[in-house]
């Protein structure tokens, strides 16, 4: 649906902070997105988190979900960061971690649009590995002009 080249048009992030590798579903009617991040042992964060037992930091799982939600927001508006708008992560509610994400996992990212009030967007997000939830949260983003 969206390869990394198109994703780079919709997210301002770059290595090592671009955490969406591919979008597999984008449903405008359901206002939802499904994407994934392939988690490799070569990720720079594994050098320190934790060398003897590497796990993906929870804050980066949240960031990956927020990036998927950001793509959805841009697509819903038919806009891109190059148009002068960005989404800033401003909060999360109902955050839960259920199991660690390890090197070799494919982290599936799902986001569903919940609401928009003025420039504040809310998304229901979850991350899965092998079909099992590893993280879920309601993510709040602020839309800002550059």
UniProtKB/Swiss-Prot annotation:
Lyase in keyword set: yes
GO terms, biological process: fatty acid biosynthetic process; lipid A biosynthetic process
Active-site residues, as the UniProt record annotates them: 49
Keywords: Cytoplasm, Lipid A biosynthesis, Lipid biosynthesis, Lipid metabolism, Lyase
Catalytic activity, EC: 4.2.1.59
GO CC terms, sorted: cytoplasm; membrane
UniProt subcellular location: Cytoplasm
InterPro entries: FabA_FabZ, FabZ, HotDog_dom_sf
Matching Pfam families: FabA
Major localisation: cytoplasm
Keyword Cytoplasm (UniProt): yes
Gene3D superfamilies per UniProt: Hotdog Thioesterase
Reaction(s) catalysed (UniProt annotation): a (3R)-hydroxyacyl-[ACP] = a (2E)-enoyl-[ACP] + H2O
Enzyme class: lyase
GO molecular function: (3R)-hydroxyacyl-[acyl-carrier-protein] dehydratase activity
Annotated SUPFAM superfamilies: Thioesterase/thiol ester dehydrase-isomerase
Family named by the database record: Belongs to the thioester dehydratase family. FabZ subfamily.
Xref: NCBIfam families: fabZ, PRK00006.1
Function: Involved in unsaturated fatty acids biosynthesis. Catalyzes the dehydration of short chain beta-hydroxyacyl-ACPs and long chain saturated and unsaturated beta-hydroxyacyl-ACPs.
The name this protein goes by in its record: 3-hydroxyacyl-[acyl-carrier-protein] dehydratase FabZ
Gene name per UniProt: fabZ
């Amino acid at each position: 649906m969206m390869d990394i080249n198109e994703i780079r048009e919709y997210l301002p992030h770059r290595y090592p902070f671009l955490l969406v590798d591919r979008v597999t579903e984008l449903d405008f009617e359901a206002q939802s997105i499904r994407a994934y991040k392939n988690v490799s042992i070569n990720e720079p964060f594994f050098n320190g988190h934790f060398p003897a037992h590497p796990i993906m930091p929870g804050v980066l799982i949240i960031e990956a979900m927020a990036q998927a939600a950001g793509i959805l927001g841009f697509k819903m508006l038919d806009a891109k960061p190059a148009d002068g708008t960005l989404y800033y992560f401003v909060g999360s509610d109902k955050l839960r971690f259920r199991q660690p994400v390890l090197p070799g996992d494919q982290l599936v990212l799902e986001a569903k649009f919940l609401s928009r009030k003025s420039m504040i967007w809310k998304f229901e997000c979850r991350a899965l590995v092998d079909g099992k939830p590893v993280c879920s949260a309601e993510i709040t983003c602020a839309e800002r002009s550059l």
